[in-house]
Structure formats: C-alpha cells, structure tokens
C-alpha cells in the first residue's frame, strides 16, 4: 500500500549544531505599560512576522542525563519505568501522577523535556520493549466499511508523518485551589499540570479515511492498553473534529524528536491539540467509530464539570449527572499563572534592581490564540498589558521543511495549539506599595478568565485570576502563591482559610473595607476527632519501630501515633489486626474499613504525632511487594504486614450477580498461607479520587491449593436510589491480567482441627458449632464447615442456617448439599428463603427467633459462628443473647 499525497519538496533542517533556544525567563526592557504589546510590533527583530534566513524556532531543551528507575518505584508495577526525581508525586508512590516544580517548568522554555513533562496515569504503565514497538498494532473498527489493523511500522512506511508543537494540559490543572475552598473528588494538582512538546506522527484523519466511516458515524472512540479497575482507559472525540485538518488530531510516536517514553504512551498515543489531556489516549490500541459518545467508564465518570450545586453525595447517588454529555470537557478554557516571582521568593529592597520582570504562562483551547494577558496590582481595579511571546508562530515561517524525519506542518496553520509566555517589568517601588499581583488572560473569542472560582465535584477546569500575595517584612518583599501541589503545605489560600477567612467572598477571603470579618467556613466538614487534647508528644521513627512487636504495638493513622496494646483483647477483628499494623502507617486500611464509631474511639489510644522527618521516612517505606523473583521464591503468599501483588487470571460467572475471581500467586508451588476461619484484605484504588478501597474476603479454594486462590464475590451494582458496592463494582470491572493488592491473614478466629479452635490466640475445644449466614456471608462458614467434614476423625457437629432471598441466590449450594448428604450424622443444613418460589420445599422467611430456638439452643462446649449482612448480624446477636448464649460463645466474622 502506498501514499500518493502531493507535498512540497522537503528540505531537512540542520540537525547539528543545535540552534540556541531563546530564554523566556530573563529580564525584559521596562515598558510601563506597553501599548501595543511588543509582540505585535512589526519592527521588532524578534517579531513573529519576520522571515529569518536560518531557522530560529525553539528546539528541545538540551538532553538531561538519562533517568533511571527510582528506588521508590521498584516495589510497584512500574518497576520498569525510568523517571526524573524532580517530579512532584500527587497520588503517593503509585500510580504515577506528577507535575514538575513550576519554576523548573518555566525555565525550560517553550518546549518541555520528556523528563519534566507532566504525567497522568490511572494505573500501571504497560511494559513495552524497544524491539516490540514497530509491531505494535492498533485497530480501526466499528461503523466503518473497511476495518483495519495497522502497525507502527506501517504508520512510518505507508503514511505521511508530520511534526508540530502541541501543549497538553490536564483538566485538573490548578485543582489544589478548589480543594482548599472545598474538597473535590480529585487529587491536588498545582499550576504545573501543563507541558509542551514537538510531537511527530500521522494525522488521525489519514487512517480514518482509509477505514471509510459510514454515513451515520459521529464519534471516534479511543482505547488504550492500560488495564485499570474499571476496564481499559478510553474516551471519544467527534468524528468531524478528527476529519478537520485544522484540528490537527494526531497519532504520535515521537516527542521532541525521540521515541515516546513509557510514561508518555510508548510506542503510540493520540494527541488532541486544544483539548484536555484526558482525550489524548496513551498506549493506543483501538479506534472505534460510533454513532454515540464513548460508554467507557473513564469517559463518563472522569473529565466532567458538573453543575456547581452538585455535591459529592448527590453525584454519587445520581448517575444521571455523569451521563449528560453536556458536562463533558473537551476544549480548554483560557488560563494563566505566574511563575516569577516564585513561591516564597524574596526581594531585598536595599539591593534590588529598579524593576522586576514578572512573568508566567497562558493558554487557551480549541485552537484559539491568547490575545492579551493583563496584570493588576490593586485587586483588579486597574490592569496593564503584558508582553506576549508567541514562540509557536516561529515554526510557521518554514514551508516544506523536515523536522525529526517528518514534514514540519505549520506554515499553513492559523490555529494556536500552544501556550505562550507573558512578561511585564514592574517598578520595584510599585511592588513595595502593593499587596498582591494578579494575572488574567483573554483569547481571540474574547473569553476571559473569571475573577471567581467555579467549584465543581471533580475540581476540573479551574481558571480564576491567578493571584500571588506580597508580604512586607521590613526591607524584604516575600511572595506567596495560592497553593502548593499535592500535600505540600503552603500558600495564601490555606493560610487565609485557617484564619477563618471565607475564600468565596469575592475578596480572596480578606476583610472587605467597611464590613466585619466574615468568619464563616465555606463548608462544614463533619470530621470525627481522632486525637486526644493535650497530647503534644513528637514521635520519631526509631521510637515507632521499637513498638513493632505483638506485645506493645504502636501504629500510625494520618501521621498520628496510637498505642493498640490495651485493645488487643477487645478488637473485633482480633489482636492480629493490630499486630499486623505495628510500626506501620495503617491510614489506608483504617480509614477504608472502620466505622465512625471506631474512629470516635481513637482518642483513647492516641499517644503522639510523628515528626515531619519520621512521616516522610515512613511514607517511603510503603511495604508493597510485587510478584517474587525466581531467586527468592516465598513458600507462602500472604504477609500480614506487607501488601502483595496478585494477578487476576480468570472470572467465572456463578449467577447473575456473583463471580468466582481466581487470583494467580507468585509461583505455581506457592500456597496462600491463610488459616481456616481467617480472611485476607484486597485493595484497589478509586480511579478518580485515588482513595484506597479495601475489603476483607474469605477465599473458597482449599488452603492447600498451590499457585492460586479463588474468591467468591457477590456484585452489588448500582440500583435506582441506591449506590452499589465500591469494591465489588471495581472488581467486576477490572480485566483479567490486572493486579490487586492482598494482605493477611486477619481475624480473631482460627479452626485448628478436631474440635480445637483459637480465639484471639487462646485455644478452646468445642463439640458443636452453630453456623448462621446470609448471602455471601457463606464463605467463611463454608471454609470452616469443609475443614471439619473433610476430616473423618473430627466429631464436631455442625448446624448451618443459610438465609437467602431467592433459590438462585444460594451460593456454594452443590457443595453444601453434598456435605449434608454425605455427613448426615455430623451436619444439619437448613436453607430458608424470603422470596421462595411456589415449588420450594425448604424453610421460608428470615432467620429469626423460631429457627434459632429450633436449631441453636445453648449447649455446653458449643460455639456460634455468624456472617452476613449487618441487619442479620444485629438481629441474631440480640436473639442469641435472649437465649442465654454468652458473648464469648458467639463469633462474628
């Protein structure tokens, strides 16, 4: 197959020596105010309209030393990805979501190196070897007359390749400001979630044309290779945008002249200029032409600006908000930020220059040019024009030139795909008399940044005026930006909010002249106090580690230190739950699993606060193990103190709402290491908020099985008026081949065999067990029952009361019925249904007083095991107490 596109003769640009890159960070000549701005002055030798004899457009920054795989990434699924340590991690260690320091980003100039380019990853980075890249294949399917499968090799050989600069921006850029006002569902981006590169590839229009879209096709859905909790990442754009050459939507394989790096989509990604970065799918595997927008989970539940009155609870309860395509984000809005003065930068007046060059960036979307940037020193009462450097326009002067092995495709374009840099000299004396510096930008659609924030539940597209404050400290001016990214403290917004200022009062939380200070919190957060008043002890890491033992276990939740010693006996999950957390940060597990009641108990065990140094050291010690290497094969998989990675290898449908999930362990001869009657924890992360979802499960596979474990899980889907289960929905949506974290064992009960069990470490002999369960609560009951009945020498008698709604809801029924049939003298099995069909011959109704009195009378050396929905457990507890069962004889899983 060949391409016969008519093109001008290509004249390669010189590749060596590298052309100098114009600095955008240096001082400018003083013009107060410039009118018109210098960038539209045709006589300026730097003017965009000049036609130089030699290329003078920006080329990539000088290459940095090749990054290495960082120690912090080695225990994660991204252990194969080299990274720059300067990047600021926004979601902890993994997944990798980062932005560079704002000053470093600006100082690199118009083009950003791949090492400093911001990264948004929803999960693990696909592992692609260099030798596999040319054979990387993606499909074009759906509403097309000619479905195609194309390799990267074919893109290089059979299609015209082009190069042009594009700025990519995360829709969450500047979200931290929204999170300070009111917590959104998104993590805390600063103002550096934006970067620019020269991308090389094939215009998507060329490949879609060959597939011949059908008449009613309207969208192009894209899907990547990154496996996530809710399926592969995917989204869509309109087909007519793809087919519009002015939009410049590209299938890119190079970035700044180098093959894409792993974090940036190696070996192939979409690049959608002028739109949020979430539309530029990385690790591209599918283009699907459709009549409707994408139904991918990430297209629907991410990258939306819901109406400001929709709070997180309403958004969670009503899926209709997410389904409305009007709220989906595509084109970027005008935005700008100040890079210099930097946060906490100081100017000593006695030795300062006469003027300071205030400077930063601005961008807009949809191909629209930023037409003005304005700066104010008096809270927006007066504005002055800043100079603007449109470095992107310098590429337009070169027709028929080659750059990075492809045609530089800019000479005919009138759209603007890139950011611009603005600057303005301000007299130092004026800064001395001012309290803040504001900047705002306007694009050619006359759309201007607003003064006030538009808060939304995902915190996206935040673009109010960017403001830095000026503190007068004697002879020194100190500058303060609004926030710092991630969990880094600092910024005037946090300071004002802590002082009681209302950040939405139209004056950035400051007192309005003539009015009393408004001391009203924007949002009343119902937060349970988990610390004890008067406890000021600072705990260092060494002291915490002295208490890793089972005898005196200390643990950490949100940087606060707790002594669990006195609760070892009373913990509902058993002493092991506390011992396993000893000396560790248990924040994820504790916050995800425990109720408000449990949180309210915490002040009684609070003994101190981690020092900042200890907190940082502990965060770097996240004990997560990947699958074992062949040189260190562990005989058992589970570790009570370490999260281990298990691979989802298959899903087996048991009923309409129940699946058996098979997880592959490290190696074929490895056992799970879970005692009978105990549980393991499974951890996934919410793809939007990155908060940990952790739940306890009991596998149904034999404890002696090697190489895998099977977990039976009932899926609680969303229903009208009821939100489904976070974890079960996430597990149901992840594809085979996805990793999950596991930790264990946990639980206070263990069956040792032949009537002997251990409760909180104390052995006890029993002659009978009453097992009461409902729904998926059968799993721990099933595990103990099977262990007893498989041992012919075990004389323990078991009575099982199993409650369900419908006959098809009875889980493990075949095995349960077989156990009862083959062991009639040792096992009594009673099924009861609340919505039984007409032909049902078993019991009807809930497990109530009648059944309990008939089958669960008190016995010497008897024990009751209960597992089921909260309502069942609460009811059974009260009824058993009324039947004279002692609390010590009733175990709730």
Swiss-Prot record:
Nitrate reductase is a key enzyme involved in the first step of nitrate assimilation in plants, fungi and bacteria. CDD domains: cyt_b5_reduct_like. Its cofactor is FAD; heme; Mo-molybdopterin. NADP(+) binds at residues 863-872. GO terms for molecular function: FAD binding; heme binding; molybdenum ion binding; molybdopterin cofactor binding; nitrate reductase (NADPH) activity; sulfite oxidase activity. This is Nitrate reductase [NADPH]. Binds 1 FAD. Binds 1 heme group. The heme group is called cytochrome b-557. Mo-molybdopterin binds at residue 170. Its EC number is 1.7.1.3. Residues 641-752 form the FAD-binding FR-type domain. The keyword Cell cycle does not apply. It comes from the Eukaryota. Homodimer. It catalyses: nitrite + NADP(+) + H2O = nitrate + NADPH + H(+). Residues 71-83 have a biased composition (Basic and acidic residues). GO terms for biological process: nitrate assimilation; nitric oxide biosynthetic process; sulfur compound metabolic process. Residues 536-611 form the Cytochrome b5 heme-binding domain. FAD binds at residues 695-698, 712-716, 726-728, 776, 779. Heme binds at residues 571, 594. The gene is NIAD.
